[in-house]
């Protein structure tokens, strides 16, 4: 088994899927023969009708589930061959925003956003100002010491996005990241994603928001009937 590539190692493809099929239980396949490659530093939208498999595809890329068939490489690693401990290391290089947000209720909003930095071993004095500044930028300056349970859906979404980007991940995966915010905040969050991409993060955003997609010239991965094509 090849060792895990070190953080920062150059790879020719940040994401590589070959002939991916996915089914849940004995049902029909959700994804069929999905094949595509994305280069490091790329920015793509993932679009398609509800139920087309966008969330399932992001879960595959974050290694939350395994494909029924086919191969997946993320950040240069064959995810079928990495050990559980190395899978955890690989996930720390990925920022993820799911639709259910997954904020930890026993932590404040500030602590939730700071968690990736704390887990990576950084000292609080090195990131305290960065976390505070980011929370203010996404409009949560007055909520940073609040528990997630009292946040609105849009506020939880912004906190989850801040947590996903605070550590400047190599890859950002976001599932409908602007679904609970107003158009003005959606544009602000898009600027955040674009700036993160400019600094080197590869970005893949699943969205139905055509107005949001029209604001950039980023290519789209379109899912339809379990198949994907780049448009």
Regions found by a protein language model. Give the residues of each.
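Conserved ABC ATPase signature
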Residues: 147-151, 155
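Short coil-to-helix segment of the ABC ATPase nucleotide-binding domain corresponding to the Q-loop/switch region
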Residues: 107-115
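Helix-to-loop junction immediately C-terminal to a conserved catalytic motif
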Residues: 62
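Catalytic Walker B motif of ABC-type/P-loop ATPase nucleotide-binding domains
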Residues: 172-175
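ABC ATPase NBD coupling module
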Residues: 79-95, 196-198
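Conserved ABC transporter NBD signature motif
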Residues: 70-78
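A short, proline-enriched helix->beta-strand linker immediately N-terminal to the Walker B motif
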Residues: 166-170
């Amino acid at each position: 088994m090849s060792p895990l590539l070190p953080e920062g190692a150059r790879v020719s493809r940040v994401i590589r899927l070959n002939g991916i099929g996915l089914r849940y239980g004995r049902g029909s396949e959700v994804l069929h023969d999905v094949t595509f490659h994305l280069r490091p530093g790329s920015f793509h939208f993932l679009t398609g009708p509800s139920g087309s498999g966008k969330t399932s595809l992001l879960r595959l890329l974050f290694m939350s589930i395994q494909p029924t068939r086919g191969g997946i490489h993320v950040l240069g690693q064959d995810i079928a061959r990495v050990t559980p401990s190395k899978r955890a290391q690989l996930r720390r290089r990925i920022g993820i925003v799911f639709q259910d947000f997954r904020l930890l209720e026993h932590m404040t909003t500030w602590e939730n956003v700071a968690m990736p930095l704390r887990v990576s071993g950084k000292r609080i004095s090195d990131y305290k100002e960065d976390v505070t500044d980011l929370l203010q930028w996404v409009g949560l300056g007055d909520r940073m010491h609040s528990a997630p349970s009292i946040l609105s859906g849009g506020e939880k979404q912004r906190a989850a996005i801040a947590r996903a980007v605070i550590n400047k991940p190599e890859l950002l995966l976001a599932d409908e990241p602007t679904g609970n915010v107003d158009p003005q905040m959606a544009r602000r969050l898009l600027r955040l994603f674009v700036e993160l991409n400019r600094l080197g993060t590869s970005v893949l955003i699943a969205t139905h928001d055509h107005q949001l997609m029209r604001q950039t010239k980023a290519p789209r991965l379109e899912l339809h009937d379990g198949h994907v094509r780049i448009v």
